[in-house]
Amino acid sequence: MAQWPEKEEEEQPMFGEEYTGYIPSYLEKDEPCVVCGDKATGYHYRCITCEGCKGFFRRTIQKNLHPSYSCKYDCCCIIDKITRNQCQLCRFKKCIAVGMAMDLVLDDSKRVAKRRLIEENRERRKKEEIVKTLQNRPEPTGAEWELIRMVTEAHRHTNAQGAQWKQKRKFLPDKIGQSPVAPTSDGDKVDLEAFSEFTKIITPAITRVVDFAKKLPMFSEQLPCEDQIILLKGCCMEIMSLRAAMRYDPESETLTLSGEMAVKREQLKNGGLGVVSDAIFDLGKSLAQFNLDDTEVALLQAVLLMSSDRSGLTCMDKIEKCQETYLLAFEHYINYRKHNIPHFWPKLLMKVTDLRMIGACHASRFLHMKVECPNELFPPLFLEVFEDQEV
């Protein structure tokens, strides 16, 4: 004698009293399930049904449960929202009667294959969207191309040795910068011989940053001299650090300073820069992955130069607008270049933050160098640029 079946567990508890998830647009408002009359959620196995009846029908077919179903009342049960769990046989028969298709229920292997196909299609659509988005991103206008050309030329004319830096560099001898002698108050040490070597190249390096800025019409023609000086003092270390970081060589693990002197991390650190050395070397390693061209480096420098938050500026609004102009041209140029790195533009902008941090750390570090190193070792231009900076 057939036993009364256990009460069927619903598949809906996750939805609460009423399913409130995605409802297809082809359904009428509050359209009923053709099996039990509950609120339908879509077209399932050729019929418009609720989640509960969809799940019941799928489980029944997948697990081949229907041969074991029985009815206590000669298959005359009325199936509605309240009674649907009381008789599995009558519920299943009604599913068949209203047209639910057994052949559309997938077994485990087919279900896995279908999910994989859905996932592959989803990924394909994502890639197509990315390509479409990239194709639709604006590229530089005619005016922006002219601005980009001027900034790039300014950089190339003031970037020592240009693309030949590897052939023309000279390595600082290992014996220099490896034996620090003067302890500083923050626990680091300064090798005076290395410090002396670095000061020999600092003046031309600073001069090249000044020349770069003066070649930009927005800087030299639109801003008062006082603001020009403040901007140059603020960005000088940042731009020199960027130029050095772009000449990081992973094979020799060196940075080439001012296009001529290749130094190791410890040499730069012991020569006065301390922890700032680590930050510049780390930046060099990171930037190597970006494969930046001259134009991108030039535009980065222009963005650093036109920082309207430097203390003491009088034309902040004008400087901010100048920076926005460079940023927009920069973004459009990045769109034109079509890099393969995800989120390339925001990641590159984070390097501006890193360079600003390097500049701030160097301002603090400069105070230690002033205390620990003989005053005669400091070139006048070095003192003029970095003295009286906010820490």
Curated annotation (Swiss-Prot):
Annotated localization: Nucleus
SMART domains with a match to the protein in the record: HOLI, ZnF_C4
Main location per the UniProt record: nucleus
Zinc-finger ranges (NR C4-type): 33-53, 71-95
Pfam families named in the record: Hormone_recep, zf-C4
One Gene Ontology term of the molecular function aspect: zinc ion binding
Residue ranges of domain NR LBD in the record: 143-388
Region (Modulating): 1-32
Entry GO CC: RNA polymerase II transcription regulator complex
GO annotation terms (biological process): cell differentiation; negative regulation of transcription by RNA polymerase II; positive regulation of transcription by RNA polymerase II; retinoic acid receptor signaling pathway; thyroid hormone receptor signaling pathway
DNA-binding region: 33-100
Transmembrane intervals: none
Keyword annotations from UniProtKB, A to Z: DNA-binding, Metal-binding, Nucleus, Receptor, Transcription, Transcription regulation, Zinc, Zinc-finger
Function: High affinity receptor for triiodothyronine.
Recorded domain comment: Composed of three domains: a modulating N-terminal domain, a DNA-binding domain and a C-terminal ligand-binding domain.
Similarity remark: Belongs to the nuclear hormone receptor family. NR1 subfamily.
Protein name: Thyroid hormone receptor alpha-B
Source species of the chain: Paralichthys olivaceus (Bastard halibut)
